[in-house]
UniProtKB/Swiss-Prot annotation:
Gene (name only): TEF
Organism: Podospora anserina (Pleurage anserina)
Region of interest (G3), ranges: 92-95
Name of the featured protein: Elongation factor 1-alpha
Family per similarity comment: Belongs to the TRAFAC class translation factor GTPase superfamily. Classic translation factor GTPase family. EF-Tu/EF-1A subfamily.
Region (G1): 15-22
Residues in tr-type G domain copies: 6-241
Amino acid sequence: MGKEDKTHINVVVIGHVDSGKSTTTGHLIYKCGGIDKRTIEKFEKEAAELGKGSFKYAWVLDKLKAERERGITIDIALWKFETPKYYVTVIDAPGHRDFIKNMITGTSQADCAILIIAAGTGEFEAGISKDGQTREHALLAYTLGVKQLIVAINKMDTTKWSEARFNEIIKETSNFIKKVGYNPKTVAFVPISGFNGDNMLEASTNCPWYKGWEKEVKGGKATGKTLLEAIDSIEPPKRPTDKPLRLPLQDVYKIGGIGTVPVGRIETGILKPGMVVTFAPSNVTTEVKSVEMHHEQLAEGVPGDNVGFNVKNVSVKEIRRGNVAGDSKNDPPMGAASFDAQVIVLNHPGQVGAGYAPVLDCHTAHIACKFSELLQKIDRRTGKAVEESPKFIKSGDAAIVKMVPSKPMCVEAFTEYPPLGRFAVRDMRQTVAVGVIKKVEKAAAGSGKVTKSAAKAGKK
């Protein structure tokens, strides 16, 4: 297959902190990945010097993580690996303290979640206990529209590759993911050792009893033996190129001799030079002079592309991180006066009532919003209302809440523009709730700034 023919997909790796996520992810990136041999050799040498030889795959990931946390410049190719069918990007390094926030504000939408479960005695039980991280992560993935799941049952070597233990874990995990919302029949369960490499890329000889995984897919069944094959059997995503443009800004740079360059990831639609874009909620309209990615000019940017684009006659003071760019002629973005959202309270020590005003992280925006009204309490499993106008909600509850941003922000309904329709509620330095936006009351549009070049381009 030619390099260009492969589809890009995003996976998110979830599971308990000691399940071996780093080692498993590191192994895939290491064996099929974007890390060049020189870097690997350098890492291995350092690991050996520090007596961490046994930890090499996780060590690779730790090095990458450290570099990523130091600055944004880390080559994102390092988080990629290739399968026969796909280019895979690992969206978040597991164990990252911002994992939940990242999942929701989602630098990108995952196409599939890989749940890593440790098979060791006691380890498995700890991972999916009632207060386990695993439950929270899986629930989060499902709520945020990650509908495909792979379960990798790791550290099988610690159970001496016991078939009975494997089957017991499948049974327990099936019940567990069913409660979250997944259908176990559509899930591949793969017994692996992320450290030794069993069933990662090649079928292991340590489990002669293992006949392979099987899952239901549209129009039939998929089967395979390894984790790599399970990743290859992910159904390819439909990318939202046909929707109107939405591009949340991550940063706005001023570049000498070029001018103002907003940077961000295209979530929906297409961005082309010559287009007239509107930034919300700043309400500034201008022409796009050029679009580039990785220092190369693009004829057009599509969803998933992280682009910089040059705009005319707009100063860096007028637009900022958290603004959203869209096509001025095709459902241009607008600020929100208020919005209704389905909110799930994850961990709040007290109870939440009307008037609560935490910070919301939605796409790249970070803005305080008031819970102005609790409309209904909802049964999380069925989505049906169980109480009208509740006074309070507490941890574990789901509710429809009317929210009012403290200053202008641009959000959308999750059904129309998913990446702009989900958010994390942050308070006391943690994620206390997550939400999905049901409907948006747009702010009355005042007359905004329209640059000369936009007016001219608009007449063309």
